[in-house]
């Protein structure tokens, strides 16, 4: 068993408790749990600093450390618990390399803060304070009330996007991606792990049996339906490569042509993941897509059953809910994730187009050579409405580290 253990981070404050429940569950199923930890970092803390250069690299460090410990100790199976942007794909990459019976447990989302706030409310508050729209006292009040407890960022940002992607992929138990970090549902999720991993060991079901090309296609469609993060492209490509699945950036464009956006979730929408969980989570959405013929139903999952079998008894969303639109009247008929190619990105770039931007945009290019140059221009009110901001030399090599 491996967990991301980090006392300094609100996001992972509850991981130790969940890890204890998982270990107890394993120990009561004729197995022996051995707990070890690896690193994690918070993009929310690192954002806007040189520390962000370490973020993407941490994904590989996490994958390497899991592979190293499990490989050296010859463990029969692995249960990984994670809940931040980079440690979830890091876990899946590590599990894929090891290719022994494995399950991923999502640490869970944070509850909404005061006035329906979340982490991005704090970031926007800093911008409002910088532009003299709110006072310092108002900013401090936002900071004190936006994050009421442990859990990952509550919107459909990278963490919840990857949690949903992993559930759709079949590598976590049904319902794991939407549960609150401190909920009874999350505790039950952890208590069910022992029986689940025992079943995988008995049947010798490995990540390579689950993480197939068709499963990745399911994952992409679910991400699109939820209005998920562009970072999913980056991480799914790496995860697929690990298990020998051919997945290209162009596949997101092709699959996206027939994949509707259905979820009104932040940052482009209104609602947060705990509110989606209250009406059923991600499973009813997957059943909607399956009934429209948009998912590959025969894919194997960590339950030992196929996707179709998992979804058989899932109930539909309540009739009057406003979070998930029906497939017949989507928020957007095709994907919000667009793959662009041109002289700025000859090998491709990913854009998130929600439909609110119109069909085209023309503006004056403002080119900067670093994040710091860009921030200086913003803080000094040198960016005007209609400008197109281009930040060069911030990729994986040039940054280095691909700072966000």
Where are these regions (language model features)?
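Active-site cavity-forming subdomains of large catalytic enzyme subunits
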Residues: 52-218, 222-223, 228
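Single conserved hydrophobic/aromatic residue that forms the stacking wall/gate
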Residues: 1-11
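Glycine-rich phosphate/diphosphate-binding loops that line cofactor/substrate pockets in enzymes
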Residues: 4, 28, 68-73, 210-214, ...
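Flexible, glycine/charged-enriched surface loops at secondary-structure junctions
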Residues: 29-38, 136-142, 176-180, 201-216, ...
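Feature captures the catalytic cores and cofactor-binding loops of soluble hydro-lyases/lyases
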Residues: 18-21, 101, 248-404
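Short glycine/threonine-rich loop-to-helix capping motif typified by GTGT followed
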Residues: 47-53, 225-228, 242, 277-279, ...
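Short acidic, glycine/serine/threonine-rich loops at helix termini
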Residues: 12-16, 44-51, 88-96, 106-108, ...
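Anionic-ligand anchoring segments at beta-strand to alpha-helix junctions in alpha/beta enzyme folds, i.e.
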Residues: 14-57, 231-234, 251, 339-340, ...
């Amino acid at each position: 068993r491996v967990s991301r253990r980090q006392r300094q981070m609100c996001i992972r404050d509850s991981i130790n408790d969940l890890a204890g429940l998982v270990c107890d569950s394993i120990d009561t199923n004729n197995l022996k749990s051995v707990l070890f930890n690896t690193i994690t970092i918070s993009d929310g803390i690192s954002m806007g600093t040189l520390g962000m250069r370490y973020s993407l690299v941490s994904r590989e460090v996490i994958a390497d450390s899991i592979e190293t410990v499990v490989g050296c100790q010859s463990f029969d199976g692995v249960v990984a618990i994670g809940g931040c942007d980079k440690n979830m794909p890091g876990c899946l990459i590590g599990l894929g390399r090891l290719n022994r019976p494995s399950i991923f447990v999502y640490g869970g989302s944070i509850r909404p803060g005061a006035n329906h706030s979340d982490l991005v409310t704090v970031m926007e508050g800093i911008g409002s304070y910088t532009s003299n729209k709110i006072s310092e006292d108002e900013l401090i009040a936002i900071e004190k009330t936006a994050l009421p407890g442990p859990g990952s960022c509550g919107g459909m940002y990278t963490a919840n996007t990857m949690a949903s992607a992993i559930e759709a992929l079949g590598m976590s138990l049904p319902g794991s991606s939407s549960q609150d970090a401190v909920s009874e549902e999350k505790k039950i999720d952890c208590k069910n792990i022992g029986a689940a991993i025992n079943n995988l060991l008995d049947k010798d079901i490995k990540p390579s049996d689950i993480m197939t090309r068709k499963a990745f296609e399911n994952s992409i469609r679910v991400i699109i339906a939820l209005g998920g993060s562009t970072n999913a492209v980056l991480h799914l490509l790496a995860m697929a490569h690990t298990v020998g699945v051919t997945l290209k950036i162009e596949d997101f464009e092709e699959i996206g042509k027939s994949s509707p956006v259905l979820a009104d979730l932040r940052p482009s929408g209104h609602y947060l993941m705990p509110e989606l969980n209250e009406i059923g989570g991600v499973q009813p959405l997957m059943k909607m897509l399956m009934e429209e013929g948009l998912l590959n139903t025969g894919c194997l999952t960590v339950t030992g059953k196929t996707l179709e079998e998992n979804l058989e008894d899932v109930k539909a969303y309540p009739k009057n809910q406003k979070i998930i639109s029906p497939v017949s009247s989507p928020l957007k008929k095709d994907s919000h994730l667009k793959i662009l190619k041109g002289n700025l990105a000859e090998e491709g770039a990913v854009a998130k187009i929600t439909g609110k931007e119109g069909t085209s945009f023309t503006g004056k290019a403002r080119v900067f050579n670093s994040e710091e140059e860009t921030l200086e221009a913003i803080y000094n009110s040198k960016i005007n409405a209609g400008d197109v901001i281009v930040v060069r030399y911030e990729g994986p090599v040039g940054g280095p580290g691909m700072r966000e």
